[in-house]
Amino acid sequence: MMTPTIPVSPLDRLLVEGIGPHELVRRKLMCLFNSCASAGGETLPPLLTRGMPEWHGLNVGDKRVLNWFCRELRAAILRYEPRINVLRVSVKDAYHQPLALYLEAILQDEPEPLRLDITYYNGRWR
């Protein structure tokens, strides 16, 4: 006969494993970066519009286009991760084959910012 057990939430399981808030948010953001935004996202509920804005085909030589992409990216991240209070997104390198981004996020109740250098390489964000 099996003894009843109390189910453990995934968040509690992660906390037991010693994974801190920065690592949790970093993992969540990497999942977001490697998903695509749905077409017509403005007319869909927020849960269905998550995903990265597409950057292929953009004129990366135009600073206005890169600024637009950073704003879209920032909006997608803030919709996806409520623990981020302040977020700065900038293009680190757009003039070579892989697109490189820099993100700096201030998390709720965390004194140190989360800093990420993310590069698009071989079809994935790393």
UniProtKB/Swiss-Prot annotation:
The keyword Cytoplasm is annotated on this UniProt entry: yes
Domain of life according to the entry: Bacteria
Keyword list, A-Z: Cytoplasm, Stress response
Keyword Methyltransferase: no
GO-annotated cellular components: cytoplasm
Molecular-function annotations in GO: anti-sigma factor antagonist activity
Record's subcellular location: Cytoplasm
GO terms under biological process: cellular response to oxidative stress; DNA damage response
InterPro entries: Anti-adapt_IraD, IraD/Gp25-like
Function: Inhibits RpoS proteolysis by regulating RssB activity, thereby increasing the stability of the sigma stress factor RpoS during oxidative stress. Its effect on RpoS stability is due to its interaction with RssB, which probably blocks the interaction of RssB with RpoS, and the consequent delivery of the RssB-RpoS complex to the ClpXP protein degradation pathway.
Family that this chain belongs to: Belongs to the GpW/Gp25 family. IraD subfamily.
HAMAP family: IraD (MF_02010)
Quaternary assembly: Interacts with RssB.
Official protein name in the record: Anti-adapter protein IraD
Source organism phylogeny: Bacteria, Pseudomonadati, Pseudomonadota, Gammaproteobacteria, Enterobacterales
